């Protein structure tokens, strides 16, 4: 059972979103009403978005947002009880599991882009990051050009690995590109010398470095390969459910509730090691809060 968010936050969101929720039930809303269950897809090591803590509970910034959505849906569907099923997903399985109906919401660190919107839908952007690479300081890898001829790792099924494959072809870098399944695995490859660099979203790299045995040994590139807006995934062509989810997100921003949730995960100590990531809210995300968008176009951010 998940920990409830503060009642003041829940009340603001539910009251604000209530007028638009659950009218003619179809698609996912009907499924939730009929089964009394909502299935949330989660990651295992996407700190601080969706991951296992030291008690083997799934926690994180994206999970808190998904629980807000779950609480609002439960209230508006007037369900005495709404069972939450947690289904693990990886970078490779998350889109298929949304598309085939196994998972209702994917609560993680997934980039919303125009290509993915052909398969799934996204709610309002909840974080904006950039694609960079992490390496050992001793290797002196500062730019993409410095990676020439090296073995690098990224995650299968991500925009990150697609981008580095494209850059490798464009620049003729002669990279040996390995595909890991999870973030912790990618970091371990650099830590143990199997790869010279790990290409991934910078916020995830900062989290991995901060939680490592020797954070002072690693550096994250100044070079940014792209802008990556994160969104909670849901099925395409399900306008009633998307309307519900979007309204919850919009009200979370409008009410200011997002500030407490953001601070909890990015500006305060987080489990399992009590590390403070100390990542202030970016100008790009503040812009989203002021003018909520679900755009998959990086230029919007």
Regions from the PLM with identified roles:
Residues 67, 78-146, 286-299:
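Acidic, polar ligand-binding/catalytic clefts
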């Amino acid at each position: 059972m998940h920990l409830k968010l503060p009642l003041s936050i829940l009340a603001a969101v539910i009251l604000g979103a209530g007028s638009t929720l659950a009218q003619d039930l179809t698609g996912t809303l009907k499924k939730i009403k009929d089964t009394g269950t909502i299935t949330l897809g989660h990651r295992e090591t996407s700190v601080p978005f969706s991951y296992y803590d030291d008690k083997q509970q799934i926690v994180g910034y994206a999970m808190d947002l998904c629980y807000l959505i779950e609480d609002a849906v439960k209230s508006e569907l007037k369900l005495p009880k709404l069972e939450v099923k947690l289904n693990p997903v990886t970078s490779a399985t998350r889109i298929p599991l949304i598309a085939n109906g196994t998972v209702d919401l994917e609560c993680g660190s997934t980039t919303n882009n125009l290509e993915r919107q052909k398969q799934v839908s996204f709610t309002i952007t909840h974080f904006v990051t950039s694609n960079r690479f992490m390496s050992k300081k001793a290797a002196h890898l500062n730019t993409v050009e410095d990676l020439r001829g090296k073995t690098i790792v990224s995650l299968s099924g991500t925009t990150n690995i697609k981008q580095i494959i494209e850059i490798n072809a464009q620049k003729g870098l002669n990279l040996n590109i390995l595909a890991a399944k999870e973030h912790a695995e990618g970091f371990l490859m650099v830590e143990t010398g199997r790869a010279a660099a790990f290409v991934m979203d910078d916020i995830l790299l900062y989290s991995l470095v901060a939680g490592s045995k020797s954070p002072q040994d690693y550096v994250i590139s100044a070079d940014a390969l792209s802008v990556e807006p994160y969104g909670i995934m849901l099925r395409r062509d399900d306008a009633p459910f998307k309307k519900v989810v979007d309204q919850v997100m919009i009200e979370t921003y409008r009410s200011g509730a997002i500030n407490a949730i953001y601070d909890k995960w990015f500006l305060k100590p987080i489990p399992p090691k009590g590390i403070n990531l100390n990542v202030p809210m970016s100008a790009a995300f503040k812009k989203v809060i002021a003018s909520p968008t679900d755009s998959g176009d990086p230029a919007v951010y």
